Structures are given as C-alpha cells and as structure tokens.
C-alpha cells in the first residue's frame, strides 16, 4: 500500500471513530439526576496526573467540581472549547473542572498520557487549545467495568444513571456491563464545596455549558 493510501485509510478510520456517539436519548432524559448524599466525599480519593504523580482530591476542598470523562476523538470533544470560557467567567475561582481521559468508548482516547495535551492543542479541538488554569486533566483511567477507578465507582453508586439504556455492546470496551455505568464520553458529575456529588448530566445535556451553568451557580451560592 502506498504512503498516500495508508494515510487516507487512517483518516477514514479516524472519521468513523469520531462519528460514533453514545445512545440517542429523548428530551425527557435530559434533566440531570440528583445524587444521594452520604458522609463519603470525593476527598476520600486520589488519582494519577499526566506526569504519573498521585493527587489527592482533598486539594479541591471548598471548590465546586465538574468531573468529566473526556476523549480526544469523540463527537463531543468540541465541548472542550466551552470549558475555558466557563472557567474564565467564574470570577471567584470557585469552579474547577477535572478531566479524566478514558478509552472505553469505541477507543476514542488512544493516546498515552504524555501525548494527550499535544493532541488537544494541535488536533482536537486544536487551534492551539490549552486548558484554563482551573481545568485539571488527569491520567487515563477506566470509568466502567472490572477495573473502574474507585472515584468513578463511588460517583456511580451515589448518582443514578441519566438514561435507561447504556448503548451498543460493540462500542463499549469493558466488562462487565453495569446498570449505573457511565454511558459515553463527556458525562458529567457536579460536586459541591463539601465534596458531595449532587448532579449527574448526560453528555448531550450541555448546550455550550448553558444547561449545566444554573446548577453550578446553585452550588456556588451554598455556604
């Protein structure tokens, strides 16, 4: 195969991967789900950063957190473009976004940890994109299945799923399938200033962030 044909085949494959969305939903499922409040908080967990260091989530005490499982080659990837303006408009710096790359949905995050930031900067969303100082991108992890990260196990236990159907089996790169699973890239959990998960949002429940902003404002007003 010539070099040109090889490049073309890779481009076509990438386009097919990016085109894959999670399960389609009706408008009745776009309302966020409220989470069960318990004594356990996200501060009980730590996660690996891109450089391999472990970070305790206690560093985010008294912050409102938007926790997102992200992927570079997903139809929802352009939501990255909305994160910086939302954080930039948060004048008191209370809001932080924690991005957790995951490759479990149709292999849409194939990069290694050291490649992720360059992929975001030069490929998708590209155009020199870099994260706001209050957006923290962690190392790759698994959000579902046998090896789901303890943080995500906790979030799924506390917050009901946003839709009754998870998706097509061939698009889900993990086992076993659970009823509370994260359904696709860019699902979001909103955490209050005490570290308690409060709301869970479907990836399509976004609209440049306007669908989530009222709930962020609600938690920021709380003492």
Swiss-Prot record:
Glycosylation sites: 39, 92
Segment forming the signal sequence: 1-19
Entry-linked Pfam families: GSHPx
InterPro entries according to UniProt: Glutathione_peroxidase, GPX_AS, GPX_CS, Thioredoxin-like_sf
Annotated active site: 74
Any one GO BP annotation for this protein: response to oxidative stress
Record field: catalytic activity: 2 glutathione + H2O2 = glutathione disulfide + 2 H2O
Gene Ontology cellular-component terms listed: extracellular region
Compartments it resides in: Secreted
Protein origin, superkingdom: Eukaryota
First-level EC class: oxidoreductase
Subunit comment: Homotetramer.
Protein name per the record: Cuticular glutathione peroxidase
């Amino acid at each position: 195969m010539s070099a040109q044909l090889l490049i073309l085949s890779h481009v076509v494959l990438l386009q097919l991967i990016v085109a894959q969305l999670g399960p389609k939903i009706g408008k009745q499922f776009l309302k966020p789900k409220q989470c069960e409040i318990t004594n356990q908080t996200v501060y009980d967990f730590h996660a690996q950063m891109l450089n391999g260091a472990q970070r305790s989530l206690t560093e985010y005490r008294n912050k409102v957190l938007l926790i997102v499982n992200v992927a570079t080659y997903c139809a929802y990837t352009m939501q990255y473009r909305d994160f910086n303006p939302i954080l930039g408009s948060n004048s008191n710096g209370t809001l932080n976004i924690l991005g957790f790359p995951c490759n479990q949905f149709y292999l849409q995050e194939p990069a290694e940890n050291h490649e992720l930031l360059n992929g975001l900067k030069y490929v998708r969303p590209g155009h020199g994109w870099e994260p706001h100082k209050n957006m923290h991108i962690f190392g790759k992890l698994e959000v579902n299945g046998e090896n789901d990260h303890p943080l995500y196990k906790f979030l799924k236990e506390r917050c009901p799923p946003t839709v009754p159907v998870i998706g097509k089996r061939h698009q889900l790169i993990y086992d076993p399938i659970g009823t509370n699973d994260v359904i696709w890239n860019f699902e979001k959990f909103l955490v209050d200033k005490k570290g308690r998960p409060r709301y869970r949002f479907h990836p399509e429940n976004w609209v440049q962030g306007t669908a989530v902003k009222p709930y962020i404002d609600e938690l920021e007003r709380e003492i």
